Structure formats: C-alpha cells, structure tokens
Amino acid sequence: MKSAKSQVNQDQQGENQRALSPLQSTLSSAASPSQAYETYIDNGLICLKHKIRNIEKKKLKLEDYKDRLKNGEQLNPDQLEAVEKYEEVLHNLEFAKELQKTFSALSQDLLKAQKKAQRREHMLKLETEKKKLRTMLQIQYVLQNLTQEHVQKDFKGGLNGAMYLPSKELDYLIKFSKLTCPERNESLSVEDQMEQSSLYFWDLLEGSEKTVVGTTYKHVKDLLSKLLHSGYFESVPVLRNSKEKAEEVLMQSEMKKQLLKSESIKESESLTELVQPEIQPQEFLNRRYMTEVKFSRKQENVEQSWEADYARKPSLLKCWNTLPEPDGQEKKKESLESWKSSLKTQEVSKPVVSLVQGKLRPTLQEEQKQQVPITPVSQWKPESPKSKVGSPQEEQNVQETPKPWVVQSQKEQDPKKLPPGSWAVSVQSEQSGSRSWTTPVCREQASVQPGTPVSWENNAENQKHSLVPQSQISLKSWGAASAGLLPNGQVLTRKLNVEPKDVPKPLPQPIDSSSALPKDPVLRKEKLQDLMSQIQGTYNFMQESVLDFDKPSSAIPSSQPPSACPVSTVSAEQNLSNQSDFLQEPSQASSPVTCSSNACLVTTDQASSGSETEFTTSETPEMVVSPCKPKPASALASPNPPLSKSFQLPPASGSSEAISTAPFQAMQTVFNVNAPLPPRKEQEMKEPPYSSGYNQNFTSSSTQTVSQCQLPAVHIDQTTQPPETGAGYHPDGTVQVSNGSLAFYPAPTSMFPRPAQPFISSRGTLRGCSHGGRLLMSSYQSPGGYKGFDSYRGLPSVSSGNYSQLQLQAREYSGTAYSQRDNFQQCYKRSGTSSGLQANSRAGWSDSSQVSSPERDSETFNSGDSGLGDSRSMTPVDVPVTSPAAAILPVHIYPLPQQMRVAFSAARTSNLAPGTLDQPIVFDLLLNNLGETFDLQLGRFNCPVNGTYVFIFHMLKLAVNVPLYVNLMKNEEVLVSAYANDGAPDHETASNHAVLQLLQGDQIWLRLHRGAIYGSSWKYSTFSGYLLYQD
C-alpha cells in the first residue's frame, strides 16, 4: 500500500501543469466560507466511505484465502502473507467506521454552529442598514421643516418648545437643506439629481471633515442630532391661519352640498304633488324618472319646452293620451289606440305636466298623428315583422318563398316609416327576362315635421356609410345576403330605379342596374376608379362550397323564377380589385374564371370570339350579375330566411354555344386562396433554401381548359380557346415541348376540351395520362432503376430536325455539390447526351390554374423522359391528381436534403486524477470534428439533428490500486458504463460502446465516477462517435 501511495504522489507531482485541483476550484468558487467548509467535509466523508468499502472487499478476499487453507489448498507466498495481515485489516476496518461516525457528527455540529453565526451576522448587518436608513429619513424630515418660516422663527426665538439656535448655525442648516432637498432641476435627470443628494447624505452620515456650506459635515451632524433630541419635531406646530382657511373651505363645500340636496328634494316633492292626483288611476306610469323632471310654476310657454324635452328624453311614456276627459268617449278611444300603438312599437316620450294641459291637448294629438314613430331593430317581434313590399305581384312572389313575410294591413301604420334595418327584396318573375331588378320604394309620407326625433339622423348616417363596406354587410344582411340593398324607408333625392340598357348577348340575363352612381359614363368611370383605389389592397379570398349533395336546389335548376340579389357598384368594384389581385399575370394567354367571396366574375380573353363585356362604357351597366350564395343555417344571424335557394350564373361574353351542364350539377369545388404570391422577380431574387449542387427540371405544358370553379349553375357558356402556349405557339396548331422531343396536336372541340394523345418521336414511351389539360410525365428514371432527380437534361431534338423550346418563367434551384467521378453523380442519371451538363436548368410552372397552395397550387409539376433508358416506371408524381368532376390538387416537389456528415474523435494526452467523484472527462486533443459538433473545452457532443448515433470510448486506468469507473452520459442520464480493476496497481482499460437514438440538442459526454485516467502522447484514452442514420 505504501508503494501504491508513493506512486500516486509521484504521478500527482508530475502533473504540475494544472493550476488548481478540482477540490481547490470548488472551494474557490464557493459563495461563502460555510459552503466551502461543507463541500470540504462532504468530500472527505466520501473518500472515507470508499476507503471502508475497499477494506471490506480486502477482508472478504482474505476470508476466502483462510477458507481455502482450511480446506487444504495451497496458496502462493503473496496470498499467505496477506492472510497473516487479516487481523490488521479487521482493526483498520473498525477504526475507519468509527472515524466516519465521529466525522459525521462533528461536521453536523460544526455546520449548525456556523449557520447560526452567519444568521446572527446577517441580522446585525440588516439592523445597521435599517438604522442608517431611519437616521437619513429623520434628517430629511428635519431639513424639510427648517425651510418653513414659522419654524425658523421658533428656533431663532426659542418659542413653542424649540431650542435657541444662533442665526449663523441656523443659516448652515438652511443652506444644507437646500442642497439635500433641492427643487427639481430640469436640466438634470432625476437619477443624476438624486445621486448628488445621496452623496451629501452619505458624507453627513459618515461625519467626515469635508467642508460644506461654510462648515464641516461633522458640525452639521452634531447640530441635527441636537435638533432631533430637542423634541420639537415630535409635533411641529401648524399655522392657525392656514387651519382656519381649510376649515372654512370645507364648511362652505358641505353647506353647498346640503343646499343642493334640499332643493332637489323640495322640487321632487312639489312635482309629485302636482303629478300624482292626475295620473293616479294609471298603473303604467314609470316613477323612476320623477326626480329627474324639473318643473317651474312660472313657466308659461310649455310647448317650446315640450319639444326640447321630447327630443332629449324620448324614453318616457305618453301619459297625456290616457288622462280622463269629460268631453266624450272618442278621445278616450283615440288615446287608448295611441297607447296600444306606442306599446307595440315601444316608443316612449316625456310626460307633460302643467296647469294648461287641456289647452295643449289638441295640438299634441295633431303632432302625434304627423310624427313618425321609430322602431328599433332590436325590438322587432319575430312573429309579426312590419316590413312591406311594393306591389301585389311582388307580394305574391314573396309568399312563394319558404318563409314568407307577414304583411300587416293596419291603417294606422300607413304613415309610418319602416325601421332602418328592414330590407325588402323584389323577386323577378319569369316573364321579365330583360327587365332589370328593382328595389320597391315605400309609400310616400304625408308630411315630415321638424320635430322628428334625432334617431333618424342615425338612419341617414347608416345610409351614407352603407356604400363603402358592402362586402362585409352582405354576409350579415337580413335578406338573401346581398351587398347592394337599400332601405325601403330611405327618402331618395333621385330616381331609384335606373332604366335597364340592353347588351347584345346571345342569352340576355337580368342585370341589376340600381346604382347610386351618376348616369354620365365619364363621371361613373371616375367614381368607380375612386372606389377601386379605396378598396385596393391585399385580400384573402375563399369561396364557400355547398357541401350538402342532397339539396335539390344545388343540383337541379329550380322551377321557380330565379331570385338574384341586386349587387351594388361596390361589390362589382371589389370583384374587379379581387381579379387584379388574384390573377398574377399568367404567361399563357388564357381566359381565367375568377371566384371571389361575393360574386363570380367572368371575363374573356381578347382572342375570344363574340362580344365582350366592358365595365366602364356607357353601353353596359356598371353592375355585374352576382349570384346569391345561400349560407348554412347555422351561420344566419337573423330570423329572416334567405329569399332564394337557386343559383343563376351570368353567361361568359363571347360565348358560341350554351350547353346544359348535367355532369357539373353535383360538382363541388373549393378555392382557398390564402394570399397572392409575390412577383416572379422577387422569388427569383430570393436565395434558394437548399444547398447548391444539383439541379431540378420542371417543364409545364398545359392546354387551355375552362377552370371548373363555378358552383352548381343553370347555364354555362363555353368559349373556344386558341391553343396558345407562350413562346411555343405554332400557327398550324402544333404545340412542341422541349421535353424529350415531345409534340402535342390539338384535339377536336368537344364538350370538355382535352388534349389529344401525345406522340413521342424518340426513345422511351410516355407514362401517365392527361386530365384537365395537364400532361404528367415521369422524369424519375435512371439506367439502374433508381428514381431520383435529373441533374441535367439533354438538348431536345425532334425527329424532323426542328428545335423548339418553351420559354417559361421559372424558379431556379441550385443543388448540393457532389463530387463527380466517371461522369456520374450520386442518385442521378449518367450523362448520355453530347451537350454535357446544363448549369442552370429552369423549372417551368403552369399558370393556367388559379387555385392556391402554400407555394401556388397552379404550379403543377410535369415530368418528361430525357430520352435515356428504355424501361420507365410510374413514379408517385406521375399519378394523375385531377378528375373531371373535381378541382386540380397541387403536387409539391421538393429536393431531398443531403444527410449531414457528423463524426468526431478526441483523446487525452495527460493524466486525469480528480480529487472528487463524478467529474466530467475533458479532452485536450481533437483528432476529428466533422460537423463541428464536439465541444473540446467541455468534452461534450451536441446532437445537431435527430438520428441514430454510434459512440465508442476507451479509458486506460492509471497504475494505482484504485478501480476505474467511467459512465457514458446523455444529458444527466447514465446510459452505459465501463469498469477496470484487477486488484493490482497496473494499467487496465475500461471500454464500452453504444448505438443511441438521439434528438436534436441532446448532449453526450463521459463522466469519471471514480479513479484516475492515464494519458500520454500515444493517446490510449479516446472518445469517438458518428452519425449512423439521420431521421
């Protein structure tokens, strides 16, 4: 054992390059002496515990030797010598156990005593701090009071219990108070000013000999201590004048309040005495408002005050109509009828109580007949709505709707206006095909008095504001969710119904021309442009689809006359702005059909045959027909039902024939355009998200098809599209694509335009099929059968020798750099053309569709054979993603990321013999660190990505009689361990390895639980790891 200890000492002396031992570093980093002492005691107890365990193991080995001797076995001389020391080992074991108990008890007592001392010291320090703060506050209070004149007089004359101070010393204190309690200096910040004051207070508390205000801080401190002990500042006298003034102000305010209360009580009592005998038989009087009524006996002109109070307080009851009259029963009946009508409409007005009430009654009744009662929208009764329709024919059509309006025929309601929230939509009959939709106007009022309640101004304001947010109001309106309805009660200053203008169309459709715009085409165009500039911006468009296939109205044209909602100019202009935001200038000239949330706007290309629709000319009205979409029942916010459940679509201008679209009657198409894409130039300027080195080819060739974005309709007009495909347009109708010498030939016109069967003029047959005007071809074929991305594409060649290539806008993808060998790239095709490698292959994306996706749903990927290889197979991209009765779904193609290269190997070139347990193993030599994932200073591997990793470690034990324990740790968890000990002071290796599934951010490191590690320039102790598979 002595030799072993000497060897350990020699080894430790050889490690002079270490500045501090781990124990010394822990002691130096301790926050307090008690923590350092506690750490030192704990480490000593741990070492003693391990020593006891080793002695117990030696005792067990010696007992085994003794048993073997008893059994007659022969032992070697070393074993016999060890058996002779059995008693000594027992003695050492008992001594070590007793020593452990003693040290444990002593350490506990010492720690308790030290904690008590620390607590006492902390309390004393806290008390001194509190005392300093208390003294500073007392000094500040004294100095603040010394600034008052009456306090200075008391100290100069020694009055009111104040001690006598010479004027010189008093001047010192006054000057010092101005320094420590200064007025706010705007040139300095509050922090700087308070810092200066704190310096004065600090020097005062210290009592230094520094000069201040003509004396020293020590002298000022003595003067202040005398003032504090004098007792004058225990109760500083306050000036009597200020007290009396404050009391007088309080008394005057209290007297005013009492007088106001008494006057209000007297007035309320006099009013109750006057009003109570007249309206005592009426039980409906609301007595809550009696205290708010102000009545004057000297008031003679009651009519003027009644008009003012009527406009100000319309919520009181009409009590003058129900007072008993001796004239006859007719007035009673009229008053009762007026009372009932006021209860129905819940209109209340102020009661008029005066001595000359009988004289005012005829005037009030006449004004009541002339004035128009107001019915709030929130007070409607669902069972008896009071809206009206304009004509008997329209009334009959309205009654044919599922939930007809109830029309009342009471005479007393004729001169009344409809409430501002009531909307009436006229329904057009089948005979009036070319007549425009009209909104019926209510009957004219007999007269409008100047005393009309103020709430009609709100109605006018609502009518003014109803022109701008029509697209929002249309979703919550009371009728059939229209954006262009006008209230029936509005008094129009011009003619409401504009005469319709016929437009030369094959199938004329009813177009709503009721508009608030001027009739002059120039003024109308300017108004439209102004409104379009107001609503221009970024929008989110989504067309709601009717997902219920069982509704007959959504699949079968209704036999009833179609009820379309009148659309205002704002909705049409919003559709125009929607179209400008929605169409992203496709490179192929096509006729897009744009679907927005309010209406379906159909436009045609300039190449289309037939007449075209222009929105700003005087020959066509400024409205575009917008079909009303029925909302789900759960989405309706009002009890009023929609007026129609059938749909009617406007025909596309320039249509050559009308086709009854029976196959499209059950088609449901959902468009969800989240946001318009930025221009192509911005996307090309953006840095590609993948590393550069491989390229990706996408070519898109699309025949012109009608985008199937309409909801179930009655008629759809199909336009004949010219086969234009950008730069690859040929006058003979042939469309050639630079995709392995591929040519398209136009098919004859049919019900659904589709391209003809394509033909391949070179090697390789075409895979896939064409649906919806898109040809999907596989480009994922290598000679070995592996499906990967094409890093290059050969020059397209046609059998006739002609060359044609589509010039399409594209996004460029630069690939990952791979080292090429023998003209071969990993996971890619061999080069089979003489053209070599194209550096910048572009990705062409089709812009013929207007559906949306996180990138762009219209960017359908088309792949084609490069002309290399005879055997082609269908890839997942080649599967057609469209069907004749469904929308085109997006296919997103992203390049596969390259697996990261992660590997490291570290070693130790010096011994590691810490004095404490569970220390991290830090390495001083880095053999390899691929990926920069191993931290040499901490000895930790940081997991960069999720995946499966392999770790191997070998640790050579220092030649001491101490076993070696090494743990492989993941964060703070022990994964695997290694052990080395043969019972002799010699070098042994502790090694192990593990295959682990790690997550990004995990840390792998080695921990030396116990023992010492041997290190040399031959690097016996190493730690390595690498990434096996990436998730």
UniProtKB/Swiss-Prot annotation:
GO terms (BP aspect): cell differentiation; negative regulation of cell growth; negative regulation of translation; positive regulation of dendrite morphogenesis; positive regulation of dendritic spine morphogenesis
Gene Ontology CC annotations of this record: centrosome; cytoplasm; cytosol; mitochondrion; nucleoplasm; plasma membrane
Domain C1q: 897-1031
In-chain residues carrying the UniProt-annotated modification Phosphoserine: S852, S853
Location relative to the cell: Cytoplasm; Cell membrane
Signal peptide: none
GO molecular function: metal ion binding; RNA binding
Domain of life of the native organism: Eukaryota
Residue ranges with Polar residues bias: 425-439, 446-458, 830-853
Residue stretches of biased makeup (Low complexity): 608-646
Tissues in which the UniProt entry reports expression: Specifically expressed in brain (at protein level).
Residues at which Ca(2+) 2 binds: E988
Topology versus the membrane: Peripheral membrane protein
Region Disordered, annotated ranges: 1-27, 364-458, 500-520, 605-658, 830-876
Protein keywords: Calcium, Cell membrane, Cytoplasm, Differentiation, Growth regulation, Membrane, Metal-binding, Phosphoprotein, Protein synthesis inhibitor, RNA-binding
InterPro entries documented for this protein: C1q_dom, Caprin, Caprin-1_C, Caprin-1_dimer, Tumour_necrosis_fac-like_dom
Chain sites annotated for binding Ca(2+) 1: D982
Comment, domains: The C1q domain is essential for the function in Wnt signaling.
Protein's job: Promotes phosphorylation of the Wnt coreceptor LRP6, leading to increased activity of the canonical Wnt signaling pathway. Facilitates constitutive LRP6 phosphorylation by CDK14/CCNY during G2/M stage of the cell cycle, which may potentiate cells for Wnt signaling. May regulate the transport and translation of mRNAs, modulating for instance the expression of proteins involved in synaptic plasticity in neurons. Involved in regulation of growth as erythroblasts shift from a highly proliferative state towards their terminal phase of differentiation. May be involved in apoptosis.
Family indicated by similarity: Belongs to the caprin family.
Subunit annotation: Homotrimer; via C1q domain. Found in a complex with LRP6, CCNY and CDK14 during G2/M stage; CAPRIN2 functions as a scaffold for the complex by binding to CCNY via its N terminus and to CDK14 via its C terminus. Interacts with LRP5. Interacts with LRP6.
Protein name according to UniProt: Caprin-2
